[in-house]
Amino acid sequence: MSAGTPYFTAIWTYDTSATSFGNHTNEARRRGGTSFELFDDAADYLILGDEDRFDLSYFDIDTAGSLGDLTWQYWSMDSGTNEWKTFVPSLADLEGNDEEEEFDFSEDGAELFLDLPNWGSAVYTASGTEPDAVARYYIRVTPASVATSPTVKMVRKRSYNAYCSPSEVYEFLNLRWTTGGF
């Protein structure tokens, strides 16, 4: 399990023309590590996966990309019809993001994944040549076109379990002695 770590347990690329996966999980963990290319062509995928739910991914870009519109998808366990659902990432909606633009792999940055109804953990299956058969929460992204493919040095995540619940904050701060609660 990867609970509390900033690293994904699966960083894969999928080349649709060659129907092959690239497993970049280890390279993506190294600060200043070996760069790897994300998309050769339109319709190729970058796949982010982890056994624990996550709500943010950070990309340390080495070569700026020039891509067409991005399509982001997550694996939905929606009432028995498990399928990829398209969504719009949430970073553009954050206060303080003056440009209100989505992350586009043209520079270092992050993307936020907040409203993913029925996001579920499953084994990734596409062509039978997947790097492993571990059930994870997956998000994937594909560009409409590729003028310049971005390369990335490192990819990080923020786990849902990086947050404290109100009761954990209450216990941690020992508020029962100051509020009279038991």
Segments (PLM) and residue ranges:
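Contiguous beta-strand segments within globular domains
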Residues: 29-58
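Predominantly extracellular/luminal regions of secreted and cell-surface proteins
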Residues: 1-25, 76, 91-102
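Non-cytosolic beta-sandwich-type ligand-binding/adhesion modules
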Residues: 66-119
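Exposed low-complexity, polar/acidic, P/S/T/G-rich flexible segments that act as propeptides
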Residues: 2-19, 134-162
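Short, polar loop/linker segments at the starts of domains and inter-domain junctions
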Residues: 20-32, 179-182
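Beta-sandwich interaction modules
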Residues: 45-49, 96-146
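A short beta-strand element within beta-rich, extracytoplasmic domains
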Residues: 50-72
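Conserved short "hinge" loops at termini or chain/domain junctions
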Residues: 1-7, 78-84, 156-182
